[in-house]
């Protein structure tokens, strides 16, 4: 098994999923979600009790040849990407998994061993028939604890009933400091232009240091590396900003990103440029939704899933968290050219993502239409968004 190729397939799936999630979101809304968190929940579903009933759909969706391959990818993520090395200066990462399963279901003891020892998950027998609401609150409390209190009320009222058999949950949080932090002294209010033709005044961070920026046909890419720990020899994290040249060009850029295999690896700024102007807005957003209909359109039917994520960007770095609950109911080689001065002023809608560079894992993806918008863009109670 080629682990590198398997990881590349997961990156491709993440971008396809991103295209569907972002394009299906309410028009002109700020969105943040975690493909990695959703992937983990789906992988546990495929490997867990009764997973054989949906494993064919899941393997097709994840472009994987077998459950063993999915488990190999999961192991790679757990040991490399999700290892918490904050004690040595790297990002603080927490990844937690859980399975709440109805006591009435006949299960092989091997599944308990699989979840506790391989997935490092909590395995909790519960009584959905008479205590559905109590279980919902328990899962929400677990998620809140494992996301540093950032994700609250993942499962909305009514999402867990007496007909629920299992809930697979994944919680993921990330907090990283920029390799080169921004000076708060240079933060100034400037106009951010909305797609309706108006503008809002928001705080923009700025720096006079050279930045990893590159211009492509119709858009620019900024890469902001995170500080690495002294023992982070086999991984590195960066946040990417994808800024269309046109103020209303986000939809076209999203379509290109989601439909072009290898898009991320072929659009990586590899050297630092001196910029004429450099500004990116501070922002804090939260977004929650039912993933069910998105997965249905992608071939994963009869899978009920809720997801919520949040991210905050400031002068020191980024803090992000995500949680997914799946309820079962009945580097490219760039040509290096001489540096030339360009601008990177993110004063209109853009895409962003947080990625581990060596495995290619996409932890978080989002879009900003209005950085002054309220923190919560959540709409988990609807069937779709």
Swiss-Prot record:
Q: Which InterPro entries match?
A: Serpin_CS (IPR023795), Serpin_dom (IPR023796), Serpin_fam (IPR000215), Serpin_sf (IPR036186), Serpin_sf_1 (IPR042178), Serpin_sf_2 (IPR042185)
**Source organism of this protein record:** Arabidopsis thaliana
* An annotated GO cellular component: cytosol
A single GO molecular-function term is: serine-type endopeptidase inhibitor activity
Looking up PANTHER family in the UniProt record yields: SERINE PROTEASE INHIBITOR, SERPIN, SERPIN-Z1
Question: What does the entry's domain section say?
Answer: The reactive center loop (RCL) extends out from the body of the protein and directs binding to the target protease. The protease cleaves the serpin at the reactive site within the RCL, establishing a covalent linkage between the carboxyl group of the serpin reactive site and the serine hydroxyl of the protease. The resulting inactive serpin-protease complex is highly stable.
Transmembrane stretches, start-end: none
| Region ranges (RCL) | 317-341
Q: Which keywords does this chain's UniProt record carry?
A: Protease inhibitor, Serine protease inhibitor
The protein's name in its UniProt record: Serpin-Z1
Give the similarity note: Belongs to the serpin family.
Disulfide linkages recorded for this protein, renumbered to the chain, are none
Biological processes annotated in GO: DNA damage response; DNA repair
Look up the domain of life of the source: Eukaryota
Q: Which PROSITE patterns match?
A: SERPIN
What functional role does this protein have? Probable serine protease inhibitor.
Q: What is the lineage of its organism?
A: Eukaryota, Viridiplantae, Streptophyta, Embryophyta, Tracheophyta
Factors inducing expression: By beta-amino-butyric acid (BABA) and infection by Pseudomonas pathogen.
**Site note Reactive bond, residues:** 331-332
List the SUPFAM superfamilies hit by this protein, alphabetically: Serpins
